[in-house]
């Protein structure tokens, strides 16, 4: 069995199919792991969600910020913008089933035998594996509740800098987990998250900011970390234990697939902007 990991698809369904054809992906034998952000901006979020749902246990995805944003739009907590490119998905007959399927997806997945962890944006350097498991499980539990829109989705984001507080309770604790695992790029030296800078490290001019993966972390030493979210990196992190897979397909660049067993990246150029 082969394990394939794909970067942010964001509705680029044709490119996804093309890159899977290049490796002869067989869902009866192989697994497709996705770093999240299956939807938004690209031309066919509906087909993308339907495809991943149809794969059953052969698909392993985590939630990204755009997937959570879709839940907010569907729940009428946010308005969809033209740039979201979600109208066909929101009008689909099976939208409720697709949203329910998304709600079952976690914020982190792991392959223990490979010492590999996958999240959308990264892992806070302060967290141990046990903390990561615990905090992501709390969010997953909240997403599966009937009141998930009011209790979680309506309060999940903040644009103020947040720092991990082990004693935090309730929504503050859940919110840090969501913001860290789905939106994080840079941290201040005191551990606060920064949401403003999206540039690659070589272009960041604030001396107080460092990429999350440059901080000392027990998980950085022991595990391979697979993530997406940060298209500006274009996969360039210069560390064999970091697999940055968002290579900006929805922005006109390309989609990246990583074959775990061969440690090989396969790419598909964006075919058509929409």
From Swiss-Prot:
Its EC number is 3.6.1.41. It comes from the Bacteria. One of its GO terms (molecular function) is bis(5'-nucleosyl)-tetraphosphatase (symmetrical) activity. Disulfide bonds: none annotated. GO terms for biological process: RNA decapping. It catalyses: P(1),P(4)-bis(5'-adenosyl) tetraphosphate + H2O = 2 ADP + 2 H(+). CDD domains: MPP_ApaH. Signal peptide: none annotated. GO terms for cellular component: cytoplasm. InterPro entries: Ap4A_hydrolase, ApaH, Calcineurin-like_PHP_ApaH, Metallo-depent_PP-like. HAMAP family: ApaH (MF_00199). Belongs to the Ap4A hydrolase family. Hydrolyzes diadenosine 5',5'''-P1,P4-tetraphosphate to yield ADP. PANTHER family: BIS(5'-NUCLEOSYL)-TETRAPHOSPHATASE [SYMMETRICAL] (PTHR42850:SF11), METALLOPHOSPHOESTERASE (PTHR42850). This is Bis(5'-nucleosyl)-tetraphosphatase, symmetrical.
């Amino acid at each position: 069995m082969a394990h394939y990991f794909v970067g942010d698809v964001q509705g680029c369904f044709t490119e996804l199919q093309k890159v899977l054809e290049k490796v002869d992906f067989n869902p009866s034998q192989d697994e497709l792991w996705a770093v999240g952000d299956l939807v938004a901006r690209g031309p066919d979020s509906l087909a993308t969600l339907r495809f991943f749902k149809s794969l059953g246990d052969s698909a392993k995805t985590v939630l990204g910020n755009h997937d959570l944003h879709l839940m907010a739009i569907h729940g009428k907590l946010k308005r969809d913008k033209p740039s979201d490119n979600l109208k066909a998905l929101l009008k689909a007959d099976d939208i409720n089933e697709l949203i329910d399927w998304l709600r079952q997806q976690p914020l982190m997945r792991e392959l223990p035998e490979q010492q590999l962890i996958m999240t959308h944006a990264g892992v806070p350097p302060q967290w141990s594996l046990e903390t990561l498991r615990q905090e992501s499980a709390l969010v997953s539990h909240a997403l599966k509740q009937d009141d998930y829109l009011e209790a979680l989705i309506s309060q999940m984001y903040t644009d103020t800098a947040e720092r991990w507080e082990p004693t935090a309770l309730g929504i503050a604790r859940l919110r840090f987990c969501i913001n860290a695992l789905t939106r994080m790029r840079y941290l201040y030296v005191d551990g606060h998250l920064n949401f403003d800078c999206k540039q690659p490290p070589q272009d960041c001019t604030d001396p107080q900011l460092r990429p999350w993966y440059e901080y000392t972390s027990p998980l950085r030493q022991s595990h391979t970390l697979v993530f997406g979210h940060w298209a500006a990196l274009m996969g360039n992190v210069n560390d064999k234990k970091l697999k940055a897979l968002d290579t900006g397909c929805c922005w006109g660049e390309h989609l990246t697939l990583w074959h775990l067993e061969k440690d090989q990246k396969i790419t598909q150029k964006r075919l058509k902007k929409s």
